[in-house]
């Protein structure tokens, strides 16, 4: 049995096939895969071409450097970009001398400038938010102050209007009683329409005196009638537009009662 098991091994030895050949094949594949990763920032596509790419986490930049025929060309492109972004002390694949006039250098400068511009815009937007709120508060206070000014202006105008009306002409009726008494002595009654009910002011007073009424209620009634007549006189005088027109209407009813020049001088 042992001879039979050894015969396949002998045949394999004669054929030159060893069991460890598979392991050697796998080792060879591992060597090839290691060769693809020996450069930093370089990877190979399925088509066989080489790609270079660089990332910078501090500045949040990821830049595509291009596709190359060989891994060395892709690695040198990565080294140049790394030196421009991170400085000469960064890790590189080769000893690299950076050219500031290369197309890659101009691309990286433009990328950095755009990144700085975007950052400034973001900072400006954040800073403008509090200023907008302050502007809104100031506008609100301005509107409030304007409303206060309007209210004060309206109150001032109302005060001035009140003063203006206080300065307006108001006829003095203190001597009206004497005029009516003098008119009653001459037995002339002045008819002022429905306001006086065809009775003069002095006749109402004489009726209360001559009747000798001792009842308190009757006295109160006569006093009420007297006040009513006085109010009617005041209302009629204020309703007439102009003292001159008022005097003309009175003069037409009884020219002998009124003396126009003395009354005008009294009111003036």
From Swiss-Prot:
Q: What happens when the gene is disrupted?
A: No visible phenotype under normal growth conditions, but roots of mutant plants, are impaired in the interaction with rhizobia, and in infection thread (IT) initiation and maintenance.
Sequence ranges of Low complexity compositional bias: 131-146
- The lineage's top-level taxon is Eukaryota
Q: Which residues bind DNA?
A: 38-95
Do you know what upregulates this one? Induced in roots from 1 to 21 day after inoculation with Sinorhizobium meliloti. Induced by Nod factors in root hairs.
Tissue specificity annotation: Expressed in roots, root hairs and leaves. Expressed in root epidermis and root hairs.
Chain spans, region Disordered: 1-36, 114-154
Q: Where is the composition biased (Polar residues)?
A: 1-21
Q: Which InterPro entries match?
A: AP2/ERF_dom, AP2/ERF_dom_sf, AP2/ERF_ERF_subfamily, DNA-bd_dom_sf
Can the keyword Transcription be found in this entry's annotation?
yes
The places in or outside the cell where this protein is found are:
Nucleus
- GO terms, biological process: nodulation; positive regulation of DNA-templated transcription
Q: Which GO terms describe its cellular component?
A: nucleus
User: Which UniProt key words apply to this protein?
Assistant: DNA-binding, Nodulation, Nucleus, Transcription, Transcription regulation
Instruction: List GO molecular-function terms, semicolon-separated.
Output: DNA-binding transcription factor activity; sequence-specific DNA binding
| Task of the protein | Transcription factor involved in symbiotic nodule signaling in response to rhizobial Nod factors (NFs). Binds to the GCC-box (NF-responsive box) of ENOD11 promoter. Acts as a transcriptional activator of NF-responsive box-containing target gene promoters in root hairs. Functions as a transcriptional regulator required for root infection by symbiotic rhizobia, infection thread (IT) formation and maintenance, and nodule development. Necessary for NF-induced gene expression and spontaneous nodulation activated by CCAMK. Functions downstream of CCAMK to activate nodulation gene expression.
Q: Member of which family?
A: Belongs to the AP2/ERF transcription factor family. ERF subfamily.
Q: What is this protein called?
A: Ethylene-responsive transcription factor ERN1
Origin species = Medicago truncatula (Barrel medic)
Q: Which gene encodes it?
A: ERN1
């Amino acid at each position: 049995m042992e001879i039979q098991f050894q015969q396949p091994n002998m045949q394999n030895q004669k054929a030159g096939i060893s069991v460890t050949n598979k392991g050697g094949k796998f080792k060879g594949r591992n060597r090839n895969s290691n060769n693809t990763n020996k450069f930093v920032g370089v990877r190979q596509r399925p088509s066989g071409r080489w790609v270079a790419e660089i990332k910078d986490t501090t500045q949040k930049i990821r830049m595509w450097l291009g596709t190359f025929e060989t891994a060395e060309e892709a690695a040198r492109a990565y080294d140049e970009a790394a030196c421009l972004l991170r400085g000469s002390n960064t890790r590189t694949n080769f000893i690299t001398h950076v050219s500031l006039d290369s197309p890659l250098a101009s691309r990286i400068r433009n990328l950095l400038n755009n990144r700085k511009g975007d950052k400034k815009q973001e900072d400006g937007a954040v800073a403008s938010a509090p200023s907008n709120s302050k502007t809104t508060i100031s506008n609100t206070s301005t509107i409030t102050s304007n409303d206060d000014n309007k209210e004060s202006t309206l109150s001032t105008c109302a005060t001035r209007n009140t003063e203006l009306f206080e300065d307006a002409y108001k006829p003095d009726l203190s001597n009206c009683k004497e005029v009516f008494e003098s008119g009653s002595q001459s037995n002339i009654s002045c008819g002022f329409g429905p306001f006086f009910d065809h009775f003069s002011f002095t006749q109402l007073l004489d009726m209360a005196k001559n009747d000798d009424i001792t009842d308190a209620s009757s006295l109160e009634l006569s006093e009420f009638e007297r006040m009513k007549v006085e109010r009617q006189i005041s209302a009629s005088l204020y309703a007439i537009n102009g003292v001159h027109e008022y005097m003309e209407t009175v003069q037409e009813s009884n020219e002998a009662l009124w003396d126009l020049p003395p009354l005008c001088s009294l009111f003036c």
